[in-house]
Amino acid sequence: GMVNAPSDAGSTQPGFTLWPSQSPGTGSFNLSNGGTEFFMSSNAADEATNPVSGSGGSHTSQQLVVWSLRNTSSLDTASPALGLSNRILSVEQYAVPPKQQQPGSGTAPDATVPQGHCLNDETTLTIAGLGCWKLLVGAAAHAAGAEVVQSPDSNDTRMQQVMYANGKLWGSLDTALNPDGGPQRAGIAWFIVNPSSGSLVKQGYLGATGYDFTYPAIGVTASGRGVMAFTATGDTLYPSAAYAPIDALVGVGTWNVAPGGVGVAADDGFSGYKQQRFPDPIRSRWGDYGAAAVDGNSVWIASEYIAHVCNYTDWGGPFFAGGSGDNLLGTCGGASHGPGARTALANWSTRISKLTP
């Protein structure tokens, strides 16, 4: 479908990441017009504003697109007859956010960031020769230069998980913010919409000085009480699984780290290191989505975080001269190739929590 807003292709834009709404139960569907499924999308990214050139857009918007797919009951017939339309709502500004920061971002990785440290290490004797880097990359890639502790990617303002609950649409996306008027950080823009009237019920932002919030996902019960899950990182906080309550009266409440979801080490994945991405540029991926699922009056949430530490000696194990154990390289695994504290090339985990708002 096309959106009635200008782009470098003319007077319309293509729909960009239309996210279908989920319902908390069988009694929460919209039965109007033969059954209606709602979607939400955003239009700050180049995919919407610059579909021809693919780049050069402003990367900011004050528009939210609400889509309606009507007569969905006809899908259960031999001749489906669907109708798709959209309307644009004016909202507060959102924009493509900066990358996340974590403790040590931009500095040389020490032994607590073992993969990055290995890529810079030219003195440790290994089974591949002098220099840990030889265990991971070739000479041409190593010549790309010294690595630093990465700044994980934020999302690009595309709409994240959407709910239809209590007669309303609930959605959120990543945005740039300046918490308390300070430096720009990654934060969350959230929206509660009445799709029948095409009006905003409530909207707002979630951000905090010294922190970045990314990849939100909202789950809302049939009664209209919900939880928004996301990853929280910061100047003094390793990537952690976090959440905040949400409802249509208050909006989003105070955020907290999920029980057991505190990150304990820096993101140390291969996509954030130029030697391992060589000859392509780095793209320090941090998942594409969080998740939330409603279970009666409770909400299950899932967000990425760094669950385990892995010291340099254990990371190298028998691949270092004089090392011990039989773990696979980079896994910090136990004996007999037992489960590791991380994978060979990345160290994120997913924290799943059950909350009752």
Where are these regions (language model features)?
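C-terminal PAP-associated
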Residues: 1-357
